[in-house]
């Protein structure tokens, strides 16, 4: 998916005004303005013309998107904004902006890769959409799940509904010493919190080979095998989550099996 930033930068490189580009694409200047602000996404037909007219390569030789990374923040943010703007997702749409602001300047581990932290909640939310999960509260909680833990914002102070606050509070690990068993037992009482935690774990497990030391990776595998089957069982008990439960179970188990085979 082409992003507003790509359109704007390529248009300026070509020396085109928004009005001039609009004429070439056969749309209004207002449409171009909205595309560049990621307020709306162009149709597939218009997107293809934008790539051609602006000279933006869709794929690099190695198959990654033209900015060098498949799971790019700009692409994911534009995709989510487009989906949420056209559906009943007021909290999730607000959470998209809020999470980006709060995680500004933070990086995902390992720091050497220079991946903005917001990549993590964005990937999780795209994962949810890919599994057919289109619940406003759940999507907002996915975007906000690390805001309390990593940005110092108390869950009860988040400018969102009580249900979203409760989920974020449940998945936030206390700063002080705590019982891991009690932490997961509390999460297991809330199916949406279970879903947030399982999607989070799936994303974390997928990147632990490059982000964790060997000992930390072993501990993470053991923690996952100990506590996550129960969370997945809770998710499976919710009819609308049944397919997602199967997918997450398959994905997490496959990743763990692969991780165990990595020489350490």
Pin down the residues of each PLM region:
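Short basic helix-loop element that most often maps to the first helix and adjoining turn
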Residues: 5-20, 24, 49
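DNA major-groove recognition helix of helix-turn-helix/homeodomain DNA-binding modules
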Residues: 26, 43-63
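Active-site helical microenvironments for divalent-metal-assisted chemistry
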Residues: 66-264
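Recognition helix of helix-turn-helix/homeodomain-like DNA-binding domains
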Residues: 26-42
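The DNA-contacting recognition helix of HTH DNA-binding domains
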Residues: 18-19, 29, 40, 58
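A detector for short, charged/polar N-terminal pre-domain segments
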Residues: 1-2
């Amino acid at each position: 998916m082409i992003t507003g930033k790509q359109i704007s930068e390529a248009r300026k490189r070509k020396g085109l005004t928004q009005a001039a580009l609009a004429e070439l694409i056969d749309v209004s200047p207002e449409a171009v303005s909205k595309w560049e602000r990621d307020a709306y996404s162009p149709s597939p037909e218009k997107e293809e013309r934008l790539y051609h007219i602006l000279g933006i390569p869709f794929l690099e030789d190695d198959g990654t998107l033209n900015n060098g990374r498949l799971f790019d923040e700009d692409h994911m943010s534009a995709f989510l904004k487009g989906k949420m703007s056209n559906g009943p997702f007021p909290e999730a749409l607000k959470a998209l902006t809020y999470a980006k602001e709060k995680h500004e300047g933070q990086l995902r581990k390992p720091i050497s890769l220079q991946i903005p932290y917001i990549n993590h909640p964005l990937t999780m939310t795209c994962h949810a959409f890919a599994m057919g999960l289109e619940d406003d509260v759940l999507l907002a909680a996915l975007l906000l799940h690390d805001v309390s833990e990593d940005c110092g914002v108390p869950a009860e102070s988040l400018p969102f509904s009580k249900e979203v606050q409760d989920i974020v509070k449940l998945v936030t690990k206390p700063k002080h010493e705590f019982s891991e068993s009690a932490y997961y037992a509390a999460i297991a009482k809330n199916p949406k919190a279970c879903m947030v935690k399982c999607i989070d774990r799936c994303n974390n497990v997928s990147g632990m080979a490059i982000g964790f030391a060997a000992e930390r990776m072993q501990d993470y595998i053991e923690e996952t095998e100990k506590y996550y089957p129960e969370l997945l069982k809770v998710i499976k008990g919710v009819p609308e989550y049944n397919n997602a439960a199967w997918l997450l179970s398959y994905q997490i188990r496959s990743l763990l099996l692969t991780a165990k085979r990595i020489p350490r």
